[in-house]
UniProtKB/Swiss-Prot annotation:
Keyword tags: Antifreeze protein, Glycoprotein, Repeat, Secreted
Positions annotated as glycosylated: 3, 6, 9, 12, 15, 18, 21, 24, 27, 30
Identification of the protein by name: Ice-structuring glycoprotein 3
Origin species: Pagothenia borchgrevinki (Bald rockcod)
GO cellular component: extracellular region
PTM (free text): O-linked glycans consist of Gal-GalNAc disaccharides. The three proteins may differ only in the number of repeating units of -Ala-Ala-Thr-.
Length: 31
């Protein structure tokens, strides 16, 4: 259970990082 929770947390963090990177790229492209 702990391993699954850790994996889910890591996946969520990776998704958030990807979204942040995409937002940054979009902002840079707009600017």
């Amino acid at each position: 259970a702990a391993t699954a929770a850790t994996a889910a947390t890591a996946a969520t963090a990776a998704t958030a990082a990807t979204a942040a990177t995409a937002a940054t790229a979009a902002t840079a492209a707009t600017a």
